[in-house]
From Swiss-Prot:
Forms a cylinder of 14 subunits composed of two heptameric rings stacked back-to-back. Interacts with the co-chaperonin GroES. Belongs to the chaperonin (HSP60) family. Its main location: cytoplasm. This is Chaperonin GroEL. InterPro entries: Chaperonin_Cpn60_CS, Cpn60/GroEL, Cpn60/GroEL/TCP-1, GroEL-like_apical_dom_sf, GROEL-like_equatorial_sf, TCP-1-like_intermed_sf. One of its GO terms (molecular function) is unfolded protein binding. ATP binds at residues 30-33, 51, 87-91, 415, 479-481, 495. It is found in: Cytoplasm. PANTHER family: 60 KDA HEAT SHOCK PROTEIN, MITOCHONDRIAL (PTHR45633). It comes from Francisella tularensis subsp. tularensis (strain SCHU S4 / Schu 4). It comes from the Bacteria. It holds the Pfam family Cpn60_TCP1. One of its GO terms (cellular component) is cytoplasm.
Length: 544
């Protein structure tokens, strides 16, 4: 085992803070409508230019291992916030940095770290309650468009696209984002379906950056049993390999030996394949598989229907124009099923809904109906260059996630104003001792940091703006885009409540853990062995 280096107390915390500051200082310049760009170097191809906080955070690896630990912990704040709410990564990073900077000063001055953490936790719980109280529902198209615009870094065309997509497929409908062929953004609604099962192995992923599998014009095999013997699949795999197309397998399960064979063949390029588990359970699973078979024009391979897997051939496969698989979901777009068969299937489900006895059965049938009839909205992102395309696609993805979060939990005034207004909930809140009270005061001050950073990025004087906003009430705030004050909601500057809440909770959680850190352990980097000296050339015989 390699020797380890151990740092304690202030030395450990100082190293950790250096790492946090390096990452946070790179991320926070992107905050707000006048946030700056960050250029990310790539091992090949053009550098990426982005204003997306989580993309910047993901690129940062520091040489000093102890500083890197601090950076990686705060990177987790950004990633967690992005996973839960789809946006707010920069806000979470700024909050974590502000809390940690002041918290570590307090610990160095002799305060009890555990009591500081308890004070921060107590204040966080109160602020979350206040944010929920300040929240307003987001249901009308105008609010949805405004949230999408803000989350896409004030790009109004993206906000309108997302609002239009939600209007066409419903707020719970499936919306996907893909790269377009032209310079303009487009919105298409196609026949499609999404279900909550992802790939059985991450080795099926074709896009390593996003860990997604994208299959263009694939064949689709639908089976209701476990696949344990790869021999049963050989005729299908050979046929698909000859065709040069991809194959999506939807089955109850694929057991280890068969799965390993599929993975190896996929990685070697023998046949492009992806296997996913069938959605649902029991009879409901069979019904959902029949829905997918109808949508894609596949034959449902089931022993109940006297069909065995080893007897299947290419004629039993369905097709779709595109399939996207993530670790959690599978989206089938534009299946090749006959319109008459799909309409007939929809009518059968409608009849079942009318006859359903329980609310649960009715709800599940309505889910199936929505999947089969709702379609999928596809936002095609247009751009002039590949670098612009990638950056814009990331922004549209973020905006889509944030808009869904707004529909789910409502909206609050944006631009850091909601956190300033929530400060009043901490009036009169006290802990069990002075150190806990200081923890509460720490968070009270830290929640001003996002507004201060927005103003700083816009070239303004943050203290003046913060005092002006605090002197007023309600949704009154600062619009950094045009350097004016006013009602943030009326100006269309909104944040999803879920985004603000998640950013606050994740930042407070990580800051509390780091404040209470007393030791850090890392491997000692071994020095590379010196190169051996080159041998001299031997004397040639016969020379004097």
């Amino acid at each position: 085992m390699a020797a380890k280096q151990v740092l304690f107390s202030d030395e450990a915390r100082a190293k950790m803070l250096d790492g946090v500051n390096t990452l946070a200082n790179a991320v926070k310049v992107t905050l707000g409508p006048k946030g700056r760009n960050v250029v990310l170097d790539k091992s090949f191809g053009t550098p990426t230019i982005t204003k997306d906080g989580v993309s910047v955070a993901k690129e940062i690896e520091l040489e000093d291992k102890f500083e890197n630990m601090g950076a990686q912990i705060v990177k987790e704040v950004a990633s967690k916030t992005a996973d839960v709410a789809g946006d707010g990564t920069t806000t979470a990073t700024v909050l974590a940095q502000a809390l940690l900077t002041e918290g570590l000063k307090a610990v160095a001055a002799g305060m009890n770290p555990m009591d500081l953490k308890r004070g921060i936790d107590k204040a966080t719980a109160r602020l979350v309650e206040e944010l929920k109280a300040l929240s307003k529902p987001c249901s009308d198209p105008k609010s949805i468009e405004q949230v999408g615009t803000i989350s896409a870094n004030s790009d109004a065309t993206v906000g309108k696209l997302i609002a239009d997509a939600m209007a066409k497929v419903g707020k719970e409908g499936v919306i996907t984002v893909e790269e377009g062929k032209g310079f303009e953004d487009e919105l298409d609604v196609v026949e499609g379906m999404q279900f909550d099962r992802g790939y059985l192995s991450p080795y099926f992923a074709t896009n390593q950056e996003n860990m997604t599998t994208d299959l263009e014009n694939p064949y689709i095999l639908i089976v209701d049993k476990k696949i344990s013997n790869i021999r049963d699949l050989l005729p299908i795999l050979e046929g698909v390999s000859k065709s040069g197309r991809a194959l999506l397998i939807i089955a109850e399960d694929v057991e280890s030996e068969a799965l390993a064979t599929l993975v190896v063949n996929n990685m070697r390029g023998v046949v492009k394949v992806c296997a996913v588990k069938a959605p649902g359970f029991g009879d409901r699973r069979k019904a959902m598989l029949e829905d997918i078979a109808t949508l894609t024009g596949a034959t449902f391979v089931s022993e109940d229907l006297s069909m065995k897997l080893e007897e299947t051939n290419m004629e039993h496969l369905g097709t779709a124009s595109r399939v996207q698989v993530t670790k959690d979901n599978t989206t089938i777009i534009d299946g090749a099923g006959e319109k008459e068969a799909i309409a007939k299937r929809i009518n059968v489900i409608k009849a079942n809904i009318a006859e359903a006895n329980s609310d649960y059965d009715r709800e599940k049938l309505q889910e199936r109906l929505a999947k089969l009839s709702g379609g999928v909205a596809v936002i095609k992102v247009g751009a002039v260059t590949e670098a612009e395309m990638k950056e814009k696609k990331d922004r549209v993805d973020d905006a889509l996630h944030a808009t869904r979060a707004a529909v789910e939990e409502g909206i609050v005034a944006g631009g850091g104003v909601a956190l300033i207004r929530a400060q009043k909930a901490l009036d009169g809140l006290t802990g069990e001792n002075d150190d806990q009270n200081y923890g509460i005061a720490l968070l009270r001050k830290a929640i001003e940091a996002p507004l201060r950073q927005i103003v700083s990025n816009a070239g303004g004087e943050s203290s003046v703006v913060v005092n002006q906003v605090k002197a007023n009430q309600g949704n009154y705030g600062y619009n950094a885009a045009n350097d004016t004050y006013g009602d943030m909601v009326e100006m269309g500057i909104l944040d999803p409540t879920k985004v603000t809440r998640s950013a606050l909770q994740h930042a407070a959680s990580i800051a509390g853990l780091m404040i209470t850190t007393e030791a850090m352990i890392g491997e000692i980097k071994e020095a590379a062995p010196a190169m051996p000296m080159g041998g001299g050339m031997g004397g040639m015989p016969g020379m004097m």
